[in-house]
Amino acid sequence: MKRLLVCAVALIDSDGRVLMAKRPEGKTFAGLWEFPGGKVEEGERPEAALIRELKEELGIDVTESCLAPLTFASHTYSDFHLLMPLYVCRRWKGIPRGLEGQQLKWVIAKDLRALPMPPADVPLIAHLEELL
């Protein structure tokens, strides 16, 4: 079975809210909410991939020193196994915007469970609830 490494981030604002992104139509899991991030390319470090993805998807600049690993998801889908480290980031430059057609929403931790999410994302919520 194919293994896929995807990095994700919980961007946390000064009010303790987490930024969530809604997958746009035409993509796998369209309409579901997820933590921003993306695939790690061959030979790429996870932190570098996350910095690249945040610039491409949200138009924000993040430095590696602002990324703190929190937990990870390990989930088997029908055709691949996903490994997804989740980082926390509380400092970035710029205002997050959905540059790839995705809707964005700031959510307090206790409301995360109300959002429909891909199965791999759901277990990560408990770690954020504990943190926040």
Task: Please provide the spans of the model-predicted regions.
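Generic C-terminal helix-cap and adjacent flexible tail
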Residues: 1, 129-132
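HhH-family (HhH-GPD) DNA N-glycosylase catalytic core used in base-excision repair
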Residues: 51, 60-61, 131
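Conserved N-terminal beta-strand and adjoining loop/helix that marks the start
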Residues: 1-18, 39
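A short coil-to-beta-strand element that immediately follows conserved catalytic motifs
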Residues: 61-71
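Active-site-adjacent beta-strand/loop module that shapes the phosphate/pyrophosphate-binding cleft
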Residues: 4, 13, 71-95, 105
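Conserved Nudix-box catalytic region and its N-terminal flanking loop in Nudix hydrolases
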Residues: 17-56
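NUDIX/MutT-family hydrolases
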Residues: 86-90, 96-128
